[in-house]
Amino acid sequence: MDTNSRNRLIKSASYLSVTTALIILSIKLYAWVVTDSQSILAALIDSMLDITSSFINLIALRFALQPPDHHHRFGYEKLQDLTIFSQSIFFFASAFFVGFSSVKSLFEKTKPENISDGTTVMYVCIFLTIILVFYQTYVIKKTGSEIVKADKLHYFTDLLTNVIVIISINLSDYFWFVDPLFGVVISLYIFHSSYSLFKKAFKNLVDHELPEQDRQKIISIVNNHLGAKGMHEMKTRYAGQKAFIQCHLEMDGNMSLYNAHKISDEIAFEILQEFPEAEIIIHQDPFGIEEHVKYREYIVR
């Protein structure tokens, strides 16, 4: 798939996400007003975060998908990480709010009202969310977009939340504590999901190295090329879903620059098969010169 087609698909998923979130938010607001249910309130807050996240994604995509320019020669991919990081903070705040409100209802022993209206509304929300999640899954399969993956997690969480809400408000007729208790459970789930997003985005923002298994793939590729005698100063990072890989490749010092360049290109090509669209910088060094070597990768010969 070419870049323009990929970008169009990602943007279409974001537009559909915002539209669906607006509709669901309006429906849940009505449901909460007529039922006064804590679990519906939790679902409403979750939807408010979904729509906030979707708007942030839409704005970020406007910039993150732009090609590198004169002032941003590494590109704009880190905007994706900044977006996901911001979303996780919103989620932390919402988890606290929902948890606090639900615990308060547990102490006050409140029960929801107009349960049949609330149930009908939640079924409509489930139907709309399923359509959106199916389309997002299709877009992810075609593009691998991290922003759409994060957005899908929000709405998949929303889908589970809606099912839980239907169960809780219908059980609350028999057990008063079920509705606020499910509100607490949902808040804990939101907190857990937030932490996963926060951790990944934070690692990318501070230029954390690629996972060790990915680093070993790179080392193995270099190790399998007979022209490489060693490697040092390997540095890796992610920005959005794009990998940045650089290293100093050690080769026979008597080799011509042309052959050294050819070997570097061959190794870069093999790395690209494992990390499509990665930006790779390979510096050629003569083997045996230890000056300025800070750390060396282990190469088997």
From Swiss-Prot:
Cellular location(s): Cell membrane
Record's GO cellular component terms: plasma membrane
GO terms of biological process kind: intracellular zinc ion homeostasis
Pfam families given in the database record: Cation_efflux, ZT_dimer
InterPro entries noted in UniProt: Cation_efflux, Cation_efflux_CTD, Cation_efflux_CTD_sf, Cation_efflux_TMD_sf, CDF_Transporter
Highest taxon of the lineage: Bacteria
Keywords carried by this UniProt record: Cell membrane, Membrane, Transmembrane, Transmembrane helix, Transport
UniProt GO molecular function: cadmium ion transmembrane transporter activity; ferrous iron transmembrane transporter activity; zinc efflux antiporter activity
Topological category with respect to the lipid bilayer: Multi-pass membrane protein
Transmembrane segments: 15-35, 40-60, 83-103, 120-140, 171-191
Disulfide bonds: none
PANTHER family (UniProt xref): CATION-EFFLUX PUMP FIEF, MITOCHONDRIAL METAL TRANSPORTER 1-RELATED
Family: Belongs to the cation diffusion facilitator (CDF) transporter (TC 2.A.4) family.
Protein name as annotated: Protein p34
Native source species: Rickettsia rickettsii (strain Sheila Smith)
Record gene name: p34
